[in-house]
Amino acid sequence: MPFMTKKLQEILVSRALQKHWLFTILLLLPILSLVSFHIGLLTAIIFTLIVPGLIFHRFFSLKLHEILVFVPVISVLVSTQLIYYLSLILGYSREIIFAAFLVLVVIYGLVKSKKDSTYSFKGILKIAQLNKVSLLIFLLIFLISAVILCRSVWFENDLGIVITGSNWQDTPLHYEIIESINNGNFPPEMPNYAGNSMSYHYFVDFHTAIVEKTYGFLPKLLPFLNSVFIVIFALSVYSLARPNGKRAAIFTTVIATFGWGLSYISLFSAVTSGQFNIATNYMYQYNGFFGLPPIFDNLLQQRPLLIGLPVFAFNLALMRNMENKNKTILAGVVTGLLFPFHAVSFLCCYAAYFVSLLLNSNHFRKHQLYFLVSAIIALPFLVSSSASVSITFTPLWALSFLKDPILFYIANLGIPFLLSFIFIKRIKGTFLKIVFVILFLAPNLISITPNPWDMY
């Protein structure tokens, strides 16, 4: 009889582990992280890029391609803000980070017991196997980004440490923010102006600081995470274009990620003339004709864009159907969480919302106002940053230093810009078209950034 009881207990434990294996692993990871820095790093990556998304996607009816964007986007937004507020109360430390992860484990267990996921892991893997071309594209985007960044951002050689790019001066600032936070600068002040409150949308750097804090000084983490964020951007573009078909979505993803202006002509010219030199050739001309950095270069260097653009693209996908109450709420929540990461994308989300509201005015529903919950979520940061935000009118700013603005836009915005006009009739609905026109014209009317081209 004791043998039977023991056998029954083993069977019950085995079944419980099979049913709750993910919960068990997630519970063990933060605990084991206290004794292993390598496990701590892995845990931070999982909990800040995956776990919150696994929790909250159950509350929204999303398609698989939308979930693949939702999971990393909401994970970064939620985990970073959770740790921020906990750190304000209890202090910023490695232990508080793991305590926040344990809070997420508890929430995951409670939610999982009440709401089933639409997709199982096996189901996702099965569908993923059918989309090998898409997977290959995303893998190539990650590898290309990682190779470029690992050889250009914090690349050590005999002469010192290499940091390059069209906006190379900003990269040290990102490192200063990350390392100063992890060395006691919390709540953070400007690392290069001690005593001045942080006036920069720094939360993407705070996310990197959180991940690094679990391991220790790790400057190569920035190229890795940037590569991951570029893939998230690619996923967001794919999700936005997916209603137009799989082939169109893949094509759009490649063009949006790697498409740039026509400044690469100078690269071909330098190569064919034998004048190419990696140390001196430069695609960007500050306040000159090629004055807008290519989007891929922006994604490599402008870190706030790494989360701002994916959230904006994801919101565009959500706002196409304002009849769906849950998606309207989700768009508002994501927008509200976005503000400390990237203020310009926050404003772009509001511009898209008002366009969608206008287009749906004949079928107005009260739930369409739920998007405004974003203002409540972002309120603490809106109040604290209001003094540092300045809006200036810059009517037709390109005319102030260019003879031919039309040629300037074609040359700098390049292939994606031209294709947008050529195929604008094929885009379903008017929502994306109007948003495109408004956001294209906006930098010619107002500027809220130090440089006008930053508005692009």
Tell what function each PLM region has.
Residues 35, 56-62, 107-119, 150, ...:
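Structural signal for the C-terminal ends of transmembrane alpha-helices
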Residues 29-37, 170, 271-272, 343-348, ...:
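Transmembrane catalytic cores of multi-pass membrane glycosyltransferases
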Residues 51-67, 88, 236-251, 321-324:
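Transmembrane alpha-helical segments of multipass membrane enzymes and assembly factors
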Residues 44, 141-311, 343-347:
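Active-site lumenal/periplasmic loops and adjacent helix-entry segments of GT-C-fold
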Residues 16-23, 60-75, 131-135, 247-249, ...:
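Membrane-interfacial loop-to-transmembrane alpha-helix junctions, especially the N-terminal start
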Residues 297, 327-343:
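Membrane-interface alpha helices of multi-pass inner-membrane proteins
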Residues 2-128:
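Membrane-embedded, hydrophobic transmembrane alpha-helices
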Residues 307-308, 312-327:
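Membrane-interface transmembrane helices that cradle and orient dolichyl/undecaprenyl
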